[in-house]
From Swiss-Prot:
This is Myoglobin. Its EC number is 1.7.-.-, 1.11.1.-. Its main location: cytoplasm. Heme b binds at H94. Residues 2-148 form the Globin domain. Monomeric. It is found in: Cytoplasm, Sarcoplasm. One of its GO terms (cellular component) is sarcoplasm.
Amino acid sequence: MGLSDQEWQQVLTIWGKVEADLAGHGHAVLMRLFQDHPETLDRFEKFKGLKTPDQMKGSEDLKKHGVTVLTQLGKILKQKGNHEAELKPLAQTHATKHKIPVKYLEFISEVIIKVIAEKHSADFGADSQAAMKKALELFRNDMASKYKEFGFQG
């Protein structure tokens, strides 16, 4: 299920545009995640008070966490599938501390694709979207495998 060199190039090219505004993209991703999948908000103690889009928009903590999420994902994507060193500590905290189900990783993957498509429609066509979906699926599958190693069925 690996990606070709061309697919990785497509992923990393669009990711460069994401990195140009990590705060904006990260904030948009988390806002959309919590709006589309409100059950995910329960996993974030410090964000539970954010009930409305306006509250989410004004939250500096949410913005900061969005940067953290996309920074970590970017480090993993840049490894082009050879991401064991980056993935293991992330999987460990998500499995043992935060207890984030794999289903929620699917949700955020879908949201990431939507947000990138909205912000960069001219640069994120069908081929790039397919490559990104594949890269995020690889990430999720590897996270799920690591979860099992840590005794979390997710």
